[in-house]
Every structure is written in structure tokens, then in C-alpha cells.
Amino acid sequence: INYRRLSVTGAAHSALLEPILDRFQDACAGLHAEPGQIPIISTLTADVIDESTLNQADYWRRHMRQPVRFIQSIQVAHQLGARVFLE
């Protein structure tokens, strides 16, 4: 798993992102997710999602701007039997 530590003091998901949302959505238009082997639970919707959702640029735009439903997503994962979580 590749990662990069970000120099931020808090989560974004706010109106401060409005100026970049169009460009961000355009950048996401080329994404191509493949079917996964384990469920992915969206912190945007608190539902299990598949590659068709992950391939929608508008999904990522909304994900950048809308509130995170972290607790609800963890509850869904727990209901599905998960006991270890990776964010």
C-alpha cells in the first residue's frame, strides 16, 4: 500500500474545497477501478460500494465536499463481521 503523509491539521470536506471541485472532478473522470475481492464501505454513503460507484467522477467530488459518515461506516463494517479497520 502506497501512502504519503499530508501536512494538514484537520479533515477537509468543507466549503474551503469549493474552488477546486471542478478540477478535481475532471481529474477523477479517468479513474478505472476493477472489481475488488473484499467489500469497500464508502464513508460518503455508509454503504458497501462497487467499482461502478468508484468509477463515477461525481462520487469523488461529493466525497471531497460532503460530511464523512465515519461512525456509520464502521458500524456497517462491524455488522458485516469486520473487527480490524483500515482507513
Where are these regions (language model features)?
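Acyltransferase
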Residues: N2-E87
